[in-house]
Amino acid sequence: MGSLSMWHWLIVLVIVLLLFGRGKIPELMGDVAKGIKSFKKGMTDEDAPETAKTVDHKADETK
């Protein structure tokens, strides 16, 4: 009762293809891949130490 047979997976696949169409699925997978790449890039950027930035500014003198 708890496991899904091959026929269940086939029916799910047909429903997904009908809902999204053949062209939409590769587009969605590309978006997922871009998200994973940006997540990995964010994780590696987090590990790099940031250098301290100093801002030199002159105080306004009022008379």
Swiss-Prot record:
KW Cytoplasm (keyword) present: no
Cellular compartment(s): Cell inner membrane
GO biological process, one term: protein transport by the Tat complex
Residue spans of biased composition, Basic and acidic residues class: 53-63
Membrane topology: Single-pass membrane protein
Domain of life: Bacteria
Major localization class: membrane
Function: Part of the twin-arginine translocation (Tat) system that transports large folded proteins containing a characteristic twin-arginine motif in their signal peptide across membranes. TatA could form the protein-conducting channel of the Tat system.
Name used for this protein in its record: Sec-independent protein translocase protein TatA
Taxonomic lineage from the root: Bacteria, Pseudomonadati, Pseudomonadota, Alphaproteobacteria, Hyphomicrobiales
